[in-house]
């Protein structure tokens, strides 16, 4: 496989970023399996074609907006071995991704949360882990927060930055919209589900980052893979949000990136080949380049 350069990776990311502006990230958490029954059902039939690199057609994916960079990197890497296959990505949110896999309008649904117990007929396969970074304005004096402080801040018990080591000023809470996988992950882990006193509820990860960048009194949360240098990610109980701390579990606010496949509908050869590529050790560096933590390496 050719080396994926920063220039080529950013080119692909730019292509999907425009679509992601209209998106949302899906719903709540439960359990995710280590393998996909539906995805594996056609693996044997696609091996020869996949190895030869002569597959063609489209693989329809969609769902989580937080997985944008990961899907962009995987798509570019897969094109190196299967140039005849097109992988489409519709950033509609995790809930829509799961629904798409369930009703077979998508080959592979994308979710930034584990499947819930009542989401049946589909299987979730974790391809990566993602830390949910707690972000503040770059001018904020606050460097570290505890989970308990976050709970009190987002429920309105703590309302002034001076109470957590910052300058005097009313805390502005910025979050995602109801149904977002990022929101569900944050609220479940911090134990603030449905009790947050948001000043703004935004429909995309990038919008949250932009809002925090623009307001010195704001605090929000965003996927580690999406956080750049326009905002500051604080440590949580002294632990930085990074690949190492997410992987070893010391960073507490994290969630899975999941491929969702239909249990009753075998994947097409090209979709199976993409699934196998994305869950192989060959994809680990691509996933890491995209800012997430690979689980297969």
Regions found by a protein language model. Give the residues of each.
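Exported/periplasmic ABC-transporter solute-binding proteins
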Residues: 2-4, 26-30, 34-297
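N-terminal export leaders
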Residues: 6-10
